[in-house]
Amino acid sequence: ALENNVISPNFKVRCTGKMEMYGQTYHCWKKKGHGIVDLRSAIIQSCDTYFYEMSRRLGVDRLKVTASRFGLGNKVFNNLYKEEKSGLFPSTNWKKANLGQGWVLGETLITGIGQGYVQTTPLQLCLMTAQLANGGFKIYPTLISNKYQESLEKIKYKMSQNLAKEE
């Protein structure tokens, strides 16, 4: 949302514990609400209402583009392993093509908090979190072969050069 100039860094939402839209109520996990929250406090407190509003302003198709940049809906190892699942991050076109239905705004809200049609793998979420923590810098996992020490207690491996350096 920041990247698309939909919200500013100072954007705040008043969380009352729910958001009502078109006769539907979307609840925050904190029933009494978080009060007024900005992006930082919304992340820290996991305020659903903040992300509902941010998603509403962004729209599901732009949300999908951003999610894809973080690896959601894409295989981590491309086609290296046939067992690996790509997950799913929906869009208006996806729903029309796969379910024959139009997109509903409420679906955008719940997609914005990772619910609804969203499907991710634990590794995708781990890498997305690492990318956020590293200022947008992607960290790719490194696969290692079975190189064990004689005692078979520890795996020997080399650190990948794309890991953050200690300063």
What are these regions (language model features)?
Residues L2-E167:
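Beta-lactam-recognizing serine transpeptidase/beta-lactamase-like catalytic domain environment
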